[in-house]
Amino acid sequence: MDIGIFIPIGNNGWLISSNAPQYMPTFELNKQIVQKAEGYGFDFALSMIKLRGFGGKTQFWEHNLESFTLMAGLAAVTSRIQLFATVATLTIPPAIAARMASTIDSISNGRFGINLVTGWQKPEYEQMGLWPGDEFFHTRYEYLAEYAQVLRDLWATGSSDFKGEHFSMQDCRVSPRPQADMKLICAGQSEAGMAFSAQYADYNFCFGKGVNTPTAFAPTAQKLLEANEKTGRNVTSCVLFMIIADDTDEAARARWEHIKDGADEEAIAWLSEKGSADKSAGSNLRQMADPTSAVNINMGTLVGSWATVARMLDEVASVPGTQGVMLTFDDFVKGVEDFGEKIQPLMTSRKHIAQLKEVV
């Protein structure tokens, strides 16, 4: 099973809590995290894009780096790990995104790919005059399909004459083309999102569900397999989990409860309010805004000792259609170290990493 890391491009990572580590995003922090991840055999690193935060006393996600430029910098200081940047498709034309990706492909020597997002948080785009109107909530995957087709055309042939409702290319050219097959990611869980991923993406990211319920996402993975049957493609699932691990189950649980006790209720309320504006929202957004565990936007959470977390991650690997997991931590630097030293060696699904190290 592949292991990736969802790097903290925004302040405080993925914890909306005053009891979690409070920090600003910097290149140096993310370089340290990704270089450590590469050293421990992580397969990929992905950065999101966020253009406006949730406010509250923790100013959650009010401070963010930009995804493509961050990953370009990380490409220059890594050598093996795959890197994915996120493009907010309302902000960057596909031909420009294609050229930016080709540039980072050159920097990374073929280790780059793109995560495509349509945008669900209206204030991010409204502040720049880029919000196309609330009807976009209903047409965004048609828009994204055209965007992806232009990217595929330009990377495959170096030119595009695509004509659609949203984009019109006239002998549009991009050269040099990427040296490696450029992978696309989407994070759809709605019916429309799944259909898009099955048609255009190489991987589909989905949320894990609940606390210590590692296989609860299985119905989502199954829906993607069913969508694949309609397109004849083999698009696999990568699942998002937060790891809260310690020497004992009790110590890990105490840390998780302490984080929840410091929840920034104002920021969480803002997330719920803005998320409700999207009446067509798929389960991803509904899950993020659910009050049950909104302190970490309701991503799946694995809490326990090193052995307990290793066992649960192996359970994730057993779900049909699962390519890998993407991990977040309360403390990213220590979390990556603890994963590499104390969790990964106990995982059956990562035995190949130990074997590779023995060969080296």
UniProtKB/Swiss-Prot annotation:
For this protein, the record's CDD domains field holds:
Alkanesulfonate_monoxygenase
Q: Which GO terms describe its molecular function?
A: alkanesulfonate monooxygenase activity; uracil oxygenase activity
The cross-references to InterPro entries, in alphabetical order and at most eight, read: Luciferase-like_dom, Luciferase-like_sf, Pyrimidine_monooxygenase_RutA, SsuD_RutA_monooxygenase
List of residues binding FMN: I49, K50, N115, E124, R140, Y141, S190
Biological processes annotated in GO: alkanesulfonate catabolic process; nitrogen utilization; uracil catabolic process
According to UniProt, the reaction catalysed is: uracil + FMNH2 + NADH + O2 = (Z)-3-ureidoacrylate + FMN + NAD(+) + H2O + H(+); thymine + FMNH2 + NADH + O2 = (Z)-2-methylureidoacrylate + FMN + NAD(+) + H2O + H(+)
Keywords from the named record: Flavoprotein, FMN, Monooxygenase, NADP, Oxidoreductase
Query: Superkingdom, according to UniProt?
Result: Bacteria
EC assignment: the record states: 1.14.99.46
Q: Which SUPFAM superfamilies match?
A: Bacterial luciferase-like (SSF51679)
Pfam families for this protein = Bac_luciferase
State the similarity comment.
Answer: Belongs to the NtaA/SnaA/DszA monooxygenase family. RutA subfamily.
Described by its record, this protein's role is as follows: The FMN-N(5)-oxide reacts spontaneously with NADH to produce FMN. Requires the flavin reductase RutF to regenerate FMN in vivo.
Protein's name according to its UniProt entry: Pyrimidine monooxygenase RutA
Organism (species): Pseudomonas syringae pv. syringae (strain B728a)
